[in-house]
């Protein structure tokens, strides 16, 4: 195998697959990237056996072939080189030669036969979606997934299809983010797919490369193809909790809140929360919202803003950082907050097809 490619393009190519490569694994070849060259094309593949990615680019191929190279060391080397073009050559599965100007390096390598094959998704059900829209849907929901491995199913993002609508949901049980869109699939088709957060984060990175993304659906896998990059991931097994009772909660009070002002006030008052509980009291009185937090070790913070509230005094407590996350992922300056009492969740919406839920906290004084 022998090819020549520009340093910048090679660096970008490795960067696209680098995040999939596991930092530590009992299977040495998984720390490698598979490089295949043929017909003036290079194919780079990386996998951790759950998430796999493949990138294809044009290059000057002098000899077809394949080799696997330690990914991180290769990436680090390419970043340090200064010449415009780089030559990579390999005659066996034991050593790859990297030449840049007068510099020459040899990296221990392995053969293609040791590298896991990328799952075949060509016969899977597929549909297309605007890449920026796909990226936006995952960005606005993935922040809410659980980071606790003990809550296995909640560490992924749900992609649900029903009646020609694709719904994406992330939740950790304390907050929930949901967004949906119409897709070009038979309305009779339905299915639920729980995508690992690592795969979701990679899809977000790659989804701005092309106008359209193609999504492939299989019972145990899902794939996304965007531009010259294909990502295939196994799905998380298990049943995603039924969230319909929470999002269908009828709120007796509907309020319009100015997002930027509320973000600023929440950041201020959050400095006075207890590190173990992080609770801010929202007190609604006619025409005003007052935010209060106090901590015996810090002190007390109290701020207020004008709101379109006309009822009796209503108090509810929320985690300010969860509330801030939701506000930061809203697209409008004016958001709607629906509440009923101190015990039921708050429902936050804007003019888009998104909905956020935040569970209340116990009202108390520290």
Curated annotation (Swiss-Prot):
Name of the molecule in the record: Beta sliding clamp
Native species: Chlamydia muridarum (strain MoPn / Nigg)
Pfam families reported for this sequence: DNA_pol3_beta, DNA_pol3_beta_2, DNA_pol3_beta_3
InterPro entries: DNA_clamp_sf (IPR046938), DNA_polIII_beta (IPR001001), DNA_polIII_beta_C (IPR022635), DNA_polIII_beta_cen (IPR022637), DNA_polIII_beta_N (IPR022634)
Residues making up the signal peptide according to the UniProt record: none
Subunit description: Forms a ring-shaped head-to-tail homodimer around DNA which binds and tethers DNA polymerases and other proteins to the DNA. The DNA replisome complex has a single clamp-loading complex (3 tau and 1 each of delta, delta', psi and chi subunits) which binds 3 Pol III cores (1 core on the leading strand and 2 on the lagging strand) each with a beta sliding clamp dimer. Additional proteins in the replisome are other copies of gamma, psi and chi, Ssb, DNA helicase and RNA primase.
Gene: dnaN
Record's GO cellular component terms: cytoplasm; DNA polymerase III complex
First-listed, main subcellular location of the protein, grouped into a coarse class: cytoplasm
Family statement: Belongs to the beta sliding clamp family.
Function: Confers DNA tethering and processivity to DNA polymerases and other proteins. Acts as a clamp, forming a ring around DNA (a reaction catalyzed by the clamp-loading complex) which diffuses in an ATP-independent manner freely and bidirectionally along dsDNA. Initially characterized for its ability to contact the catalytic subunit of DNA polymerase III (Pol III), a complex, multichain enzyme responsible for most of the replicative synthesis in bacteria; Pol III exhibits 3'-5' exonuclease proofreading activity.
Compartment(s) where it occurs, according to its Swiss-Prot or TrEMBL record: Cytoplasm
Residue pairs linked by disulfide bridges in the UniProt entry: none
Gene3D superfamilies named in the record: 3.70.10.10, DNA Polymerase III, subunit A, domain 2 (3.10.150.10)
GO MF annotations, alphabetized: 3'-5' exonuclease activity; DNA binding; DNA-directed DNA polymerase activity
A Gene Ontology BP annotation from the UniProt entry: DNA strand elongation involved in DNA replication
Keywords: Cytoplasm, DNA replication, DNA-binding, DNA-directed DNA polymerase, Nucleotidyltransferase, Transferase
